[in-house]
Structure formats: structure tokens, C-alpha cells
Amino acid sequence: MDTVRIAVVGAGVMGLSTAVCISKMVPGCSITVISDKFTPETTSDVAAGMLIPPTYPDTPIQKQKQWFKETFDHLFAIVNSAEAEDAGVILVSGWQIFQSIPTEEVPYWADVVLGFRKMTKDELKKFPQHVFGHAFTTLKCEGPAYLPWLQKRVKGNGGLILTRRIEDLWELHPSFDIVVNCSGLGSRQLAGDSKIFPVRGQVLKVQAPWVKHFIRDSSGLTYIYPGISNVTLGGTRQKGDWNLSPDAEISKEILSRCCALEPSLRGAYDLREKVGLRPTRPGVRLEKELLAQDSRRLPVVHHYGHGSGGIAMHWGTALEATRLVNECVQVLRTPAPKSKL
């Protein structure tokens, strides 16, 4: 077989990072990224992009740590290069605070981020309602800059970008030999996955250039994340809610919660509301599937369902998806045994 034709469905952070990894690691392929939505219209564009990972209950901790570390190392290399501004990657220091002492005082990712330590009594004076905290430096990767940066790399490596809505993965047969499904919530339809559901997140993007440290309540519901051109204030976790329109009452409540942690935010200006739907399931779906219809075969690699951990885990899971794609390519390149009559 000559060139193996690969279609990547989805152009959020999963689709684009997987396309870049395949183009670097799987020789002799042509790559086409197909989506009906591109930056700035993806969930990844709304994400705060902080590298503080969630915990997936169905996934071994070592595997989660590997995904996070590979992502952190990839973005840390970018932040230490001339590409940092273009890619929208920065280092940011701050605090994660708790209203009661957690059962796990040191999370699994503590030795991946930089300078992780428990907060001192003096630091905790800033947060009188909280009794315990972590201080550390991590990375922030901003979708509105990072996605175009990835897109540029896909094209630079010879990949194509196609705007098209896919209703059924079989539409891609026989034009493509392998399909990588990075369609997030689209997998309800495209992969018949009833386990995936939206968790609605509403945030405010505000101007408050004096806020330099991130603050995150341990619930993950209230957070203040300073970025390159604005500060992200959050948030919400509304399971099963598909509504993409901002709710003014929720915005008021977010601002009030954030001001309780950082009173100077009362002076924030140019408030903009954003809503994203996190594609959530019990664990990330990262596996091969061979679709069969009559005599036709279509190898698919599924790579979706990261919930709130999309940007924190994306490069590690993209590398794993690429290994699965490589396995599919090897099978296609292995000649079928001739039948002995």
C-alpha cells in the first residue's frame, strides 16, 4: 500500500494535536482534518487551559500521570522557546485552597508541576474561609492562540484542513483508509456512544491586569486564572445541560464567588461571558475499533471524552492515539496471506 490516507474528525485540541503527532510519528501518511467547527468556535477556545488535571475514576493513576507529564513537558518546551507567545503558553503561579483538609494532601501530579508545596499559615491568611492549600507554578495554554498554532503545524507538515459536517463515519469510506474520531460530544451520533454527555461550563473573561496569581477553590467550581490578555473567572459544572447561551444570573454569581476570594476583582472591567460544553464520560475513550459493513472495513481510532481535562491531558493522549493509528497502518501494510487452493 502506498500513502495511507487518514481522516481526523474534529478540530478542537484533540483533533489538531493528534493530527500533528501523526504527521511527526507515522511516515507515509496523508492527513486531513475534517470538522464543521474550527477555532474560535470550539470548546477548546472557551477552556481556561490551566494544567491542573482532573482525576478519571476508571483510569489507572499511573496512566493519568503519564498523560499529564507528557502534556506538561510538551508545553514546557514551548514556553521556553521563541514560540511561546504565538502558541499562547505561559507559566503562572498561584494557590489551590481547601475549606477542609483533603484526604489526599499531595495529589498524583504534585511532582510534575513546578515548586509544589503546602501553603504556609501566612499565605492562608489571605483566605480566611480556607484551612489548607497548595502553592505551585503550572502552565496555562490558551485555546484561541494554541489552536491556530497547531493548525499551522498540521498544514506545515503537509496536512489538509476541510470544513465539512460528518453525519456518519462511513461517509469517509473509501476516500480514507483510517479514521481518527476526535469529535467529542459528536461521538454520541458518530460512534453511538451513550456514555458521553455535556457538562456545561460558563465563565467570564475580564480585564483585571493587576491580578497575577491564580486562585482555585478545591471544588474546582470557583477559580481565577490570569492569562495573556484577560483573566478567566469561573465557573459552573451543569451536567446534561446543552445550553450555549450565557445566563446573566450565573455570571453575577460567578463574579460574587470570585470577589469573595479576590476582592480587588470588584474593579474588573470589560466583562465577557463564554460558555463551553465539556465532553464528559466515565473515562477518556482511547481505543481502536474495526467498523464492518458487508465486505467493507473501516479502522477507527477513538480519542475523546476528556471532560474538564482536555488541555491538561491532550498531548499525552494524542501520543497514545498516534500509537494506535500506527498499529492500524502496520496492519494495512501487511500483505494478506495468499489462500492455498
UniProtKB/Swiss-Prot annotation:
Inhibited by phenylglyoxal; chemical modification of arginine residues in the enzyme with phenylglyoxal leads to the irreversible loss of activity towards dicarboxylic D-amino acids, paralleled by a transient appearance of activity versus monocarboxylic ones. Gene3D superfamilies: D-Amino Acid Oxidase, subunit A, domain 2, NAD(P)-binding Rossmann-like Domain. Its cofactor is FAD. It catalyses: D-aspartate + O2 + H2O = oxaloacetate + H2O2 + NH4(+); D-glutamate + O2 + H2O = H2O2 + 2-oxoglutarate + NH4(+). Its EC number is 1.4.3.1. The keyword Disulfide bond does not apply. Coiled coil: none annotated. Keywords: Cytoplasm, FAD, Flavoprotein, Oxidoreductase, Peroxisome. FAD binds at D36, K37, T43, S44, M50, G307, I311. InterPro entries: D-amino_acid_oxidase_CS, DAO, FAD-dep_OxRdtase. It is found in: Peroxisome matrix; Cytoplasm, Cytosol. One of its GO terms (biological process) is D-amino acid catabolic process. Selectively catalyzes the oxidative deamination of acidic amino acids. Suppresses the level of D-aspartate in the brain, an amino acid that can act as an agonist for glutamate receptors. Protects the organism from the toxicity of D-amino acids. May also function in the intestine. Monomer. Interacts with PEX5; the interaction is direct and required for localization of DDO to the peroxisome. The enzyme is inactive in complex with 6-hydroxy-flavin adenine dinucleotide (6-OH-FAD); the complex is not physiologically relevant but an artifact of purification procedures. Belongs to the DAMOX/DASOX family. This is D-aspartate oxidase.
